[in-house]
UniProtKB/Swiss-Prot annotation, chains A, B:
Organism of provenance: Methanococcus maripaludis (strain DSM 14266 / JCM 13030 / NBRC 101832 / S2 / LL)
Gene, per the UniProt record: proS
InterPro entries tied to this protein: aa-tRNA-synt_IIb, aa-tRNA-synth_II, aa-tRNA-synth_II/BPL/LPL, Anticodon-bd, Anticodon-bd_dom_sf, Pro-tRNA-ligase_IIa, Pro-tRNA-ligase_IIa_arc-type, Pro-tRNA_synth_II
Reported function: Catalyzes the attachment of proline to tRNA(Pro) in a two-step reaction: proline is first activated by ATP to form Pro-AMP and then transferred to the acceptor end of tRNA(Pro).
GO MF annotation, one: proline-tRNA ligase activity
Quaternary structure note: Homodimer.
Any single GO BP term: prolyl-tRNA aminoacylation
Enzyme class at the top of the EC tree: ligase
Protein known as: Proline--tRNA ligase
Length: 460, 460
């Protein structure tokens, strides 16, 4: 099955996201999908809270004159902004944009809060919906008109040094986040022509989808003093001088969810990383005539034992076990535990791993410990598999002075192996003309195994 | 100080909400305010999750034809809907409403999901931003153009009986929620002319603000089959017949936060209920020359002891203790613990309650237990005080056949005691004409101490 078909199919069948809403690029997070989102963003929140970021909530509407304040920024967004022009039947005096992102909103407010160096650093974030009038093909959780979950962090600092250090902190946080949700990544410094509108430079996380195309899943922008000058974010330094703050911003969206689904899934359905799984363990009783009560009693006991540490679901529906297996494999539940009369007689239980399909018979008396062990193997394996997949998608080419010959080789490799092609850095090909020649995107400058490359790929 | 002045003042000074945004009725949840919101809505989420409600996320934009599908419903909202008319520079073919509430969105989708009685009950909720083009005076967290937090639950049932039972469940949940965040309430069945547009009837929670005006803080609507017929929510019953589902919906907004602030605050600032306090205990070291290290070591130890159960903050700023006391009293931190050299010598610590101002010397060796005891007294006291306040605002009048004389008495009482006036039910005054006569609102039918009354009040 083609990846994109598999993807649409699994979103519907596993109850992740329903796109049958009468506006293109707008859909519904279904209960199961919402739980994955909730657990994922809780991990992100925890990482941010622990490093001194404060959660806030800013307005969704932006007056036109405020959005237009930063020239480059508005140029980057003006074709894709939704505009509110009426309240009831009354035309508004100033039209209002649905936030495409919140720099202008947040920096307008920061102006009220930042007066002196002791007000800094300021490290804020919010998790909100944002909007883009996409005219291109939309794709659920990947290219939406309503991005339902956008975690955007915005920081302000007294010195360039602290600002640069914040970029490092953001990269570290995002690495930790993607590691925890099991999504592998390649980090690149985006080329000038593809950086965030208004930024000094942009660092980006890309992952690779099963079809070999890359997906941008996180960005970290060093804004320098650009926005600060526009928004007059001036403060008094310890020496009593005036200076503009240095700023960073960084964001992660629903694409994190799309990616953890896409990277791990297989032909049977989802394979969910343990930490974000709505159900971590499903219990299936194997009922035989006359033994129903013994089995149900035992499996309820097991449910209680495991509940203290895991999100467990006891599937006691009156359908045959085989159908239950299929249902929960489709939904990507990490572990399934089967318990029948013979298991109980022998003091055993059967654990089945979703990632490898492996069946493991364990001592019932020791089950919590056994489950913990298998859960940590599952985590380790998912991480390894994801990293291997990404590695298998990376090809290193030699640089050649003959641009035409080089670009032919790149194109051939992109057709053959897909994924990311790395070429040792050379200024002569680091430009948009090269993108046109290879009919693919320059992701930017990527450090890989200690060396610096230009990375190129077909992107989503 | 006037209540409304106190309220605006405290939002700013305590860092709850900043309204200096260039759109009327739109503002920013600041870090401290956001935490109160987060803890409050977590309580609500937990209550909903435990009773089988599933969290979801639906689109924010509603096509005009979908919003207009239910005639009464759209009539109730059409004057206050914000309309998106353009994407970039392109006029949209169908204009899009910013959701004022999500009945139409959700029921359009329910049509895709409900086919047969086994698909029921369906109990969904979401916590989202909603929008009203308010032309009246706006007020932070009370009357907003962007309602930043709206928890809306929507359920569908196979029978009227189950639907009615769901109304009871919703009332029970909301009671538990307001009890936990310490906001007292009076429940009324709203009169016909004030029910939710499209509902069979509306039950509402009102609390009373310090100025004697009531604030609607939660509503529970029995929609019967009204929306189901419009949205064709038909299903196959166990007998193979066709029927329309029975529906309820119920919502709680930022007003819950506004109310817990307003009901408990005093002239020194906020008094926050323990369960939603961003900081539950603040530790203040009393430093004397030469004893700094002893005190700091001990108070760090105390911090570690208490952290296991409470949200604790150690205030080690280099300012005098008096200023710290003021800061944390303003922010409404439930308990303050002071520790100085003499306390350490005597094996004591001093605990100060924010609600009563009481100072309690406790044995340091037993401090966790002592704190737990005081915390539970604090909770109990806040609940009692809030209930007493509401009771003191309730006046019962006798019914009189002479409507003019009765309305004069109501008006006098409203001037004198403010709050809610209860009048034994009589059909002759249960109408909008009576509202005009008394220049106040009929809240509806209220059961109070076992009897049924018509309740009237000045409302926000």
């Amino acid at each position: 099955m083609e990846f994109s078909e598999w993807y649409s199919d699994i979103l519907e069948k596993a109850g992740i996201y329903d796109l049958r809403y009468p506006i293109k690029g707008c859909g519904v997070y279904l209960p199961y999908g919402f739980k994955i989102r909730r657990y994922s963003f809780e991990i992100l929140r925890k990482l941010l809270d622990e490093t001194g970021h404060d959660e806030t909530l800013f307005p969704m509407l932006i007056p036109e004159n405020l959005l237009a304040k930063e020239g480059e920024h508005i140029k980057g967004f003006e074709d894709e902004v939704f505009w509110v022009t009426h309240g009831g039947k009354t035309p508004l005096e100033v039209k209002l944009a649905l936030r495409p992102t919140s720099e202008t909103t947040m920096y307008y407010m920061m102006k009220q809060w930042i007066k002196v160096h002791t007000d800094l650093p300021l490290k804020l974030y919010q998790v909100v919906n944002t909007f883009r009038y996409e005219t291109k093909h939309t794709r659920p959780l990947i290219r939406l008109r309503e991005i339902m979950s956008f975690k955007e962090a915005h920081t302000a600092h007294a010195t360039k040094k602290e600002c640069d250090a914040q970029i490092e902190e953001a990269l570290t946080l995002y690495k930790a986040f993607f590691d925890e949700i099991g999504v592998p990544y390649v980090i690149s410094k985006r080329p000038e022509w593809d950086k965030f509108p208004g930024a000094d430079y942009t660092m980006a996380f890309d992952t690779i989808y099963p079809d070999g195309k890359t997906m941008q899943i996180g960005t970290v922008h060093n804004l320098g003093q650009n926005f600060a000058k526009t928004f007059e974010l001036e403060f008094e330094t310890p020496d009593g001088e005036k200076d503009f703050v240095y700023q960073t911003c960084y964001g992660i969206s629903d694409r994190a969810i799309a990616s953890l689904i896409s990277v791990h899934g297989d032909e049977k359905g989802l394979v969910i990383p343990v930490d974000v799984a709505p159900i971590q363990i499903v219990l299936i009783p194997l009922l035989f005539k006359g033994k129903e009560e013994i089995v149900m009693d035992k499996i309820k006991e097991l449910n209680n034992t495991l509940k203290s540490e895991f999100r467990v679901h006891l599937d006691d529906r009156d359908i045959r076990p085989g159908r239950k297996y299929n249902d929960w494999e489709l939904k990507g539940v990490p572990l399934r535990i089967e318990l029948g009369p013979r298991d109980i007689e022998n003091g055993h239980a059967l654990i089945v791993r979703r990632d490898t399909g492996e069946k493991i018979t364990v001592e019932y008396s020791n089950i919590l410990e056994e489950v913990e062990k298998i859960v940590s193997m599952y985590k380790e394996n998912l991480k390894l598999k994801a990293e291997e997949k990404v590695k298998s998608f990376i090809t290193v080419l030699d640089f050649e002075n003959d641009v035409n010959s080089l670009s032919e080789k790149v194109k051939a490799k992109l057709l053959e192996n897909k994924g990311i092609i790395l070429i040792p850095f050379n200024e002569s090909i680091y430009n948009e003309e090269f993108e046109e020649l290879i009919d693919a995107s320059v992701l930017g400058l990527t450090t890989y195994e200690g060396k610096e490359y230009i990375s190129v790929a077909r992107t989503y």
